[in-house]
Structure formats: structure tokens, C-alpha cells
């Protein structure tokens, strides 16, 4: 067994060898606790027939644990300076491919087809860059990739919002946007002390498992998300007031908004944070004829 990359001493050795300095703009925080990494991989439930997609491998700390568990690992790295480092640290593993690309611009489905032919169980497993966590998740969900789900590390505050239930202060349009596609829960919390350099916030690993069917069927998915975003324009305001302010030409359609709320059996005095995803689905369908133009 090779020495783990994710120890303080080994990480320092690698950084010194390559004269690597962290780029704050890329949100680079490397894990230095192999036990955390083993737990992350364990939550992904990978087998020798699984594939793993990683975003931001850094110096390969999580990548090597994935390589030990999965049939194939594909890691997307935006920072060109890390390519020779990864070539070195991951040289013992012949089942890893590094793709030098911004994940937000990558054709991930094409990469999966080319790099993982015949692999039916695929998970996204990553320590996500905190500054682009939400855009990465939404891109990968919207791309409808042939994956089972995600086990990903992120800022604890964002994890709380993603997994929030109706009626809580964390619940909002992000909760609905993610939970429309997946069942979401927090697998573990991670202290800031296990990173180099230490971030200012604690982290959490969340598990997102794709639904077989969405929790609500709607006329138009994009419009559902337009309605949910509008419903949280100002959290202290009622759903009725927020829809007027947040929907295009909402001020001129007050009566229709009231009719749509009644059709969806939603009191206009309620706040967006109290509505379930099923209620948002009914509301979006009721609003669709006038606002989806």
C-alpha cells in the first residue's frame, strides 16, 4: 500500500517539491486527514465495477482513495499547475484519468461515454471548490448525467440550505432546485482543522441520490424554478407579494396570481418557506398559462 497523500507531512513534502502556492481565487483547500477521505468514499458505496467523477482533485488526496475503490476515476482539474503534481502522486494508479478543464464548461456526458464505457454505476465524489459549489451541482444535475448520485464536501452553511425541509430558516429556492432531482442528506460534518490551508468555515459532506421520478410532475421544470426563486425574493414577505415582485409583469397580474394561489389551494398570506415542493409544483402549473411566455 502506498503512503497516503492526505497527511500534513506528506502534503507539505509535495507542495515543497513543486513550489506550489494556493490560489484563493480557486478555493483551494486540501484535505490532510485520511480518515475523513476513507469515510467520504465509504458513503459513496463504490464497488470494483463503479466509476467515480471528481471535481478539483488538488494533489490527489481523495483521488487515490477513489482509485483504490472504483474501477475508473475521472478527475476534472482547472489549475494547470497541478497537472504535473497529479501525474506524479497518482502514478501508482492506472485507473485514473485527469481532464484539464473547467467543469462548468466541460461536456461531462461525452467524457463519461469515452472514459467509462460499460460502467453502469457512476458517482460524483468530490471536495468541491466552495466558491462554485452551487453552479457545479446545478450544471451536473441539469446535464441529466447517467449517474447514481453525489457524495460531495461543501461549506456547512450551503449543505444546510440544500438539505433543508419546509418551515426552516435554511429552506429556500436552492433546497427545492436540488431536491427536485435528488434525495439529499448530510452524511457527516467536517471541522476546518483537517484542511490546508484552513478555511474560515466548517464543512459537511452531503449525499445526493437521484430520484427514479421527480417528487412532483409539472408542465415545465424551468418555470417551476422561476416560481420558486420569485417566492423567496424577500423571505419576510408573503407568497402573494413575492410573486408580484418576482415574476415578470407580476404587478399587472395581481388578480391572476390570487386565482392561481386559490387553484393550488395555497393561502396568499403564507410565506414561501412554508410550501412543500408539491405545493410549488401545483402553483407553477396554475401560473404557467399567463407567465410562461
UniProtKB/Swiss-Prot annotation:
<dbReference type="GO" id="GO:0005829">
    <property type="term" value="C:cytosol"/>
</dbReference>
<feature type="binding site">
    <location>
        <position position="77"/>
    </location>
    <ligand>
        <name>S-adenosyl-L-methionine</name>
    </ligand>
</feature>
<keyword id="KW-0963">Cytoplasm</keyword>
<keyword id="KW-0949">S-adenosyl-L-methionine</keyword>
<feature type="binding site">
    <location>
        <position position="31"/>
    </location>
    <ligand>
        <name>S-adenosyl-L-methionine</name>
    </ligand>
</feature>
<dbReference type="GO" id="GO:0052908">
    <property type="term" value="F:16S rRNA (adenine(1518)-N(6)/adenine(1519)-N(6))-dimethyltransferase activity"/>
</dbReference>
<dbReference type="InterPro" id="IPR001737">
    <property type="entry name" value="KsgA/Erm"/>
</dbReference>
<dbReference type="GO" id="GO:0003723">
    <property type="term" value="F:RNA binding"/>
</dbReference>
<keyword id="KW-0694">RNA-binding</keyword>
<comment type="similarity">
    <text>Belongs to the class I-like SAM-binding methyltransferase superfamily. rRNA adenine N(6)-methyltransferase family. RsmA subfamily.</text>
</comment>
<keyword id="KW-0698">rRNA processing</keyword>
<dbReference type="InterPro" id="IPR020598">
    <property type="entry name" value="rRNA_Ade_methylase_Trfase_N"/>
</dbReference>
<dbReference type="Pfam" id="PF00398">
    <property type="entry name" value="RrnaAD"/>
</dbReference>
<feature type="binding site">
    <location>
        <position position="29"/>
    </location>
    <ligand>
        <name>S-adenosyl-L-methionine</name>
    </ligand>
</feature>
<keyword id="KW-0489">Methyltransferase</keyword>
<dbReference type="InterPro" id="IPR011530">
    <property type="entry name" value="rRNA_adenine_dimethylase"/>
</dbReference>
<dbReference type="InterPro" id="IPR029063">
    <property type="entry name" value="SAM-dependent_MTases_sf"/>
</dbReference>
<feature type="binding site">
    <location>
        <position position="102"/>
    </location>
    <ligand>
        <name>S-adenosyl-L-methionine</name>
    </ligand>
</feature>
<feature type="binding site">
    <location>
        <position position="127"/>
    </location>
    <ligand>
        <name>S-adenosyl-L-methionine</name>
    </ligand>
</feature>
<comment type="function">
    <text>Specifically dimethylates two adjacent adenosines (A1518 and A1519) in the loop of a conserved hairpin near the 3'-end of 16S rRNA in the 30S particle. May play a critical role in biogenesis of 30S subunits.</text>
</comment>
<dbReference type="InterPro" id="IPR023165">
    <property type="entry name" value="rRNA_Ade_diMease-like_C"/>
</dbReference>
<keyword id="KW-0808">Transferase</keyword>
<feature type="binding site">
    <location>
        <position position="56"/>
    </location>
    <ligand>
        <name>S-adenosyl-L-methionine</name>
    </ligand>
</feature>
<dbReference type="InterPro" id="IPR020596">
    <property type="entry name" value="rRNA_Ade_Mease_Trfase_CS"/>
</dbReference>
<protein>
    <recommendedName>
        <fullName>Ribosomal RNA small subunit methyltransferase A</fullName>
        <ecNumber>2.1.1.182</ecNumber>
    </recommendedName>
</protein>
Amino acid at each position: 500500500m502506498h503512503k497516503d497523500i492526505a497527511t500534513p507531512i506528506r502534503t507539505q513534502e509535495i507542495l515543497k517539491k513543486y513550489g506550489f502556492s494556493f490560489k484563493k481565487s480557486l478555493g483551494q483547500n486540501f484535505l490532510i486527514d485520511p480518515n475523513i477521505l476513507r469515510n467520504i468514499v465509504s458513503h459513496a458505496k463504490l464497488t470494483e465495477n463503479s466509476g467515480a467523477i471528481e471535481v478539483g482533485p488538488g494533489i490527489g488526496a481523495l483521488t487515490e482513495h477513489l482509485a483504490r475503490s472504483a474501477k475508473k476515476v475521472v478527475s476534472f482539474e482547472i489549475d494547470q499547475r497541478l497537472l504535473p503534481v497529479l501525474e506524479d502522486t497518482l502514478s501508482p494508479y492506472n485507473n485514473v484519468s485527469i481532464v484539464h478543464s473547467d467543469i462548468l464548461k466541460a461536456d461531462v456526458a461525452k467524457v463519461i461515454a469515452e472514459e467509462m464505457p460499460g460502467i453502469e454505476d457512476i458517482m460524483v465524489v468530490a471536495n468541491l471548490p466552495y466558491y462554485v459549489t452551487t453552479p457545479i451541482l446545478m450544471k451536473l444535475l441539469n446535464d441529466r448525467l447517467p449517474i447514481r448520485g453525489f457524495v460531495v464536501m461543501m461549506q456547512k452553511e450551503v449543505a444546510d440550505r440544500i438539505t433543508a425541509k419546509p418551515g426552516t430558516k435554511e429552506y429556500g429556492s436552492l433546497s427545492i432546485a436540488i431536491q427536485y432531482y435528488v434525495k439529499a442528506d448530510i452524511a457527516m460534518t467536517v471541522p476546518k482543522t483537517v484542511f490546508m490551508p484552513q478555511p474560515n468555515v466548517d464543512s459537511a459532506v452531503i449525499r445526493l441520490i437521484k430520484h427514479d421520478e421527480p417528487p412532483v410532475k409539472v408542465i415545465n421544470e424551468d418555470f417551476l424554478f422561476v416560481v420558486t426563486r420569485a417566492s423567496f425574493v424577500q423571505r419576510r414577505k408573503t407568497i402573494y407579494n413575492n410573486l408580484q415582485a418576482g415574476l415578470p409583469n407580476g404587478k399587472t397580474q395581481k388578480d391572476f396570481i390570487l386565482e392561481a394561489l386559490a387553484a393550488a389551494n395555497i393561502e396568499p398570506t403564507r410565506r414561501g418557506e412554508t410550501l412543500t415542493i408539491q405545493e410549488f409544483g401545483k402553483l407553477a402549473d396554475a401560473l404557467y398559462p399567463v407567465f410562461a411566455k
